[in-house]
Amino acid sequence: MTQLSSNDVPSMGRRQFMNLLTFGTATGVALGALYPVANYFMPLRAGGGGGGTSAKDELGNPITKTGWLATHQAGDRSLVQGLKGDPTYLIVNEGGEIGEFGLNAICTHLGCVVPWDSGANKFICPCHGSQYDTNGKVVRGPAPLSLALAHVDIEDDAVLVKQWSETDFRTNENPWWA
């Protein structure tokens, strides 16, 4: 058997080069497409050591208790970014303090964001007319379930939103969202 000298060994051909280029491009696109999927299932969390997520305003800035109470009066229900970035109502109770629970603003019927109607003193879904009382309990369908609850905690003036896994105080049942 004869050995070929280094001058006789063929270099990478055009076909092999195109195969490597195609494989590299496809791999890059696939990895780029998987990043948002992985981020959805394992979101980055901001917050304290208690596992909470820092509530954020419409610009994505963390909310502080003193800043929030300076601009929101008793009985106010305003949207913040809560768990998983979902719109969540932060409630200022009648004592002028931030309530111990927040309400996920996503309607349980078809997923519309449910606005607070201060004149009617309830949440009314603009899509199909579902209505929820001041605590987010469904009072008129077609929504089948109450709005999801979230714990609201204050740690060093930071407003944190945490997963609610206890019994739903509105229905005395296990939470459907946990």
UniProtKB/Swiss-Prot annotation:
Residues 65-161 form the Rieske domain. One of its GO terms (molecular function) is monooxygenase activity. Its EC number is 7.1.1.6. It is a single-pass membrane protein. [2Fe-2S] cluster binds at C107, H109, C125, H128. GO terms for cellular component: plasma membrane-derived thylakoid membrane. It is found in: Cellular thylakoid membrane. Belongs to the Rieske iron-sulfur protein family. Component of the cytochrome b6-f complex, which mediates electron transfer between photosystem II (PSII) and photosystem I (PSI), cyclic electron flow around PSI, and state transitions. This is Cytochrome b6-f complex iron-sulfur subunit. It comes from Prochlorococcus marinus (strain AS9601). The gene is petC.
